[in-house]
Amino acid sequence: MKYLLLVPILAIFILAGCAKENSIMGPQSSTNQSTSQWIKIIHSSSLSVENTYTASKSIDGSKGGTVELTKVFKDDGNWALVTAKLTIPKGAFSGTKFISYIVNTETASIDFSPADTSFSKNLNLDITFTGVNISGYKASDLIFSYLKDNSIVPAKFTYANANIAQGLLVVLGAQISHFSRFGWSTLDGPISD
């Protein structure tokens, strides 16, 4: 009789020990994937408007320069404005480069080219969206970020402000060490130094 009870009890211990949650090797590691996402500015579905604007300029690296853009556009039936200014300091790169960027008014982002270009001195970006409908977000959940190795990472900047009620997104002094996508995203985790 003892042996008849021992076999089912032993089987229960063996099966319980083989469950996924139990491991004699320690806890299983889980992969943390970024949940940050580029924001989406709300547009009326009936509106068919241009949502990207381009600015470009040939810049001599020994002299530096600026690439600027100011565009008025319709957002959710109202007039809105985007301004962007990329400042390239003297000596940021050698030779002459054709610097270009595309501002996307649907995602409050800016894509720079030539892609994957790095600099010996940081470039400086000021970008402002005024009059945009970002009512689906809380200001405390937004951060100005950039794309690094397919992950959205908080950018370094001097000043940033997201005012949902006024439809205002402002970034001053964003530091750009390489060309990638920069823009407003939802916050995922702590802000990096």
Segment roles from a protein language model:
Residues 14-17:
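C-terminal motif of bacterial Sec signal peptides marking the signal peptidase cleavage site
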Residues 19-82, 116-120, 133-193:
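Proteolytic cleavage junctions
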